[in-house]
Amino acid sequence: MRATVRVTALVSALLLFAISFSQSSYASDTRSSHGDHASRFSTIFKSPTHKPKPLAATVSPTSGCVKTNATPHNPIKVGNPDQGNAILDRVFTLNSNCGPIIFKAFGKKAVFTVIAMSFLAKSGYFDHSLCHRVTTAGIFVLQCGDPTASGSGGPPFTYRDENLPGNAPNNYPAGTIAMANSGPGTNGSQFFIVYKDSHLPPSYTIWGLVTQGLDIVKRVAAAGIVGGGNDGTPKMTIAIESVSVD
């Protein structure tokens, strides 16, 4: 009888501990979504669950662009962005083999995104990487930022969505720079450039606007897709050779 009572008491104690631990974890997660940017920085950048998968490909020059030696490759190793970086509007220049694409980044509206993308750019993460996807019907975007060119590559951290638009017609107008993701809070390095007004689910962080070079993206889209169709690898090879941030 005494043994039964002791076992029952032990089980009750374990259940109370489990409930207490679960509530404590939830409270910690909730707190991480409040407060100033610096205090949240250590929790906002989380390790992704996917692993980059290199993709073999043959790259050839196309009229209008110079030859590139960029090929799919494993991303360089990077740490986490520096929380001390100033949160300011910045100008990114994508130096591509087809010419420069310049855009203003919205550092005040998309704080974590601009800090993260500036960090990756300055680390050389995007250097010699291929823009791996273009769409030509329904939505009109060129997708870049994945060194593996597989659509699954990314840095060793993710961060939350910011500056999302409403669900209005053409909520992603031409010239928009937005983050690609695989669900809420999974932003990494992949981004897309909208070359024609498009309507998408309001789930993709808008963090910049093209000021020069949108004609290059339109030219890449007009060249079509490898194997045909309206969504796939650009027939006109375009690579980001380097990125400068001012």
What is each of the regions a protein language model found here?
Residues 6-7, 17-246:
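Cyclophilin-like peptidyl-prolyl cis-trans isomerases
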Residues 1-10:
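Bacterial N-terminal signal peptides that target proteins for export
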